[in-house]
């Protein structure tokens, strides 16, 4: 599936649900307590992060989308910390303050990247008047493209059915991260996003893919859902919709350090993408990519548009764009470990034109990754003459790196990239023009390594020299 990142700045999302403050105490552990057989942590760092529904709102804001948050808090330091931290990341908070209850707080103690214990400070908000929340939803509906209901069973969504119907009447899709085994309370929602254990707690244990799909589709029908997205950890995600074939998205996670808040990231990216105009299938693809990024971070985290862009292009771990030769070697090694085919080409690319773009796009189609090696300014001057290059090396590389077809851009100082090609040893070496394969610098090294050498045609009439001559001719007429 080819998906382009939407302009999230055009999207507005309201998150309603159980907000909480996540506190983290970090420190080294070097001994066991004499009081009990437990480690002693010498706390040297304390962090506070918005969690629960607040983490969903932060994930939406991190993408650049308009993010609004409604929830229940106490009147205490934790509530003030939430307001302050969310304000810093452009989340518009409209909390309902309940003076008789504390703000939900979860304290985690960690040492050496391992969580040792979690302590919860909370009292349920059950029985709280729902009208202030309903009124806040009604006020926000004209300004949003999606409503997220983030349920942690703490009481903020006690009247969830009223919220669903209110949004549906306004034509706003409702996405719900469910809690518990009573999915009937979410009847009529646009999308539910249970994880596998939550799904099987309702539908029963599924031994096969067919069984999972069959039971999932039954839930969709029983509860009048538009769609069901089952998040399945290392098995990826499965999207079920009435009248459509199941869509399975394999996981994109490379390493898993912490799954805290991963579900918040999934539904946040889903909502922002839908509000920005992406179809549901594309929104799920983006959410799956975002989940693969966030589980590689410690603690509740967000994903930026750049991280998401890297992930959907499969470059989150290897990097992309302009690189040194050493950085490129490491990136190529990681790509090869995943079985990816490396394509390499080279040139001056002084004034980028349609012929270059078409050529690079065709080169990229030959494999999974495209390296563009670029002549330095001195090298270009030796090859093209004293008036070249028109554009200096840094500018040429930045423009090349911005092309969708190009993964990595690397400079070289010599007249030919033979040494660089021998160092990288691409699977396919490509050159444009009227060359014979044996005339291409680096071809012998690539062939000796079992690789291929190909010649691609340039578009007729497209050349840097022609562009320069046209500019000169027009200038002489004026």
UniProtKB/Swiss-Prot annotation:
It comes from the Bacteria. The active site is at residue 264. It catalyses: D-glycero-beta-D-manno-heptose 7-phosphate + ATP = D-glycero-beta-D-manno-heptose 1,7-bisphosphate + ADP + H(+); D-glycero-beta-D-manno-heptose 1-phosphate + ATP + H(+) = ADP-D-glycero-beta-D-manno-heptose + diphosphate. One of its GO terms (molecular function) is ATP binding. Residues 344-478 are annotated as: Cytidylyltransferase. Its EC number is 2.7.1.167, 2.7.7.70. Residues 1-318 are annotated as: Ribokinase. Pfam families: CTP_transf_like, PfkB. Catalyzes the ADP transfer from ATP to D-glycero-beta-D-manno-heptose 1-phosphate, yielding ADP-D-glycero-beta-D-manno-heptose. Homodimer. This is Bifunctional protein HldE.
């Amino acid at each position: 599936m080819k998906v382009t990142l939407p302009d999230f700045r055009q999207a507005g999302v309201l998150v309603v649900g159980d907000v909480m403050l996540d506190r983290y105490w970090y420190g080294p552990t070097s001994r066991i307590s004499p009081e009990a057989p437990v480690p002693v942590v010498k706390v040297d760092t304390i962090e506070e992060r918005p969690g629960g529904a607040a983490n969903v709102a932060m994930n939406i804001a991190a993408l650049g989308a308009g993010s609004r948050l409604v929830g229940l808090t106490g009147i205490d330091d934790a509530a003030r910390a939430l307001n302050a931290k969310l304000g810093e990341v452009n989340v518009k908070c409209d909390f309902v303050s309940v003076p008789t209850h504390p703000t939900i707080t979860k304290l985690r103690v960690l040492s050496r990247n391992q969580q040792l214990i979690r302590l919860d400070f909370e009292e349920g908000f059950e029985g709280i008047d729902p009208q202030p929340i309903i009124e806040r939803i009604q006020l926000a509906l004209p300004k949003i493209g999606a409503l997220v209901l983030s349920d942690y069973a703490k009481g903020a969504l006690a009247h969830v059915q009223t919220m669903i119907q209110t949004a549906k009447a306004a034509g706003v899709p409702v996405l719900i991260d469910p809690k518990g085994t009573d999915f009937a309370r979410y009847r009529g929602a646009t999308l539910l996003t249970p994880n596998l254990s939550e799904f099987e707690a309702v539908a029963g244990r599924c031994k096969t893919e067919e069984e999972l799909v069959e039971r999932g589709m039954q839930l969709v029908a029983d509860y009048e859902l538009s769609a069901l997205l089952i998040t399945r950890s290392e098995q990826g995600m499965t999207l079920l919709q009435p009248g459509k074939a199941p869509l399975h998205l394999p996981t994109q996670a490379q390493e898993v350090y912490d799954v805290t808040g991963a579900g918040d990231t999934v539904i946040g990216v889903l909502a922002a993408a839908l509000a920005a105009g992406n179809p549901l299938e594309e929104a799920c693809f983006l959410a799956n990519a975002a989940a693969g990024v966030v589980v590689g971070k410690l603690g509740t985290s967000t994903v930026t548009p750049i991280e998401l862009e890297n992930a959907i292009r499969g470059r989150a771990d290897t990097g992309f764009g302009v690189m040194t030769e050493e950085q490129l070697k490491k990136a190529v090694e990681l790509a090869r470990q995943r079985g990816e085919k490396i394509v390499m080409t080279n040139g001056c690319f002084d004034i980028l034109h349609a012929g270059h773009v078409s050529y690079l796009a065709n080169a990229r189609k030959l494999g999974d990754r495209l390296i563009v090696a670029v002549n330095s300014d001195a090298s270009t001057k030796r090859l093209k003459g004293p008036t070249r290059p028109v554009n200096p090396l840094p500018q040429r590389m930045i423009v090349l790196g911005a092309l969708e077809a190009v993964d990595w851009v690397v400079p070289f100082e010599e007249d030919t990239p033979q040494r660089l090609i021998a160092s990288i040893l691409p699977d396919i070496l490509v050159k444009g023009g009227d060359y014979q394969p044996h005339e291409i610098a680096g071809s012998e090294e690539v062939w000796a390594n079992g690789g291929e050498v190909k010649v691609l045609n340039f578009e007729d009439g497209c050349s840097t020299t022609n562009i320069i001559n046209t500019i000169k001719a027009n200038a002489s007429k004026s």
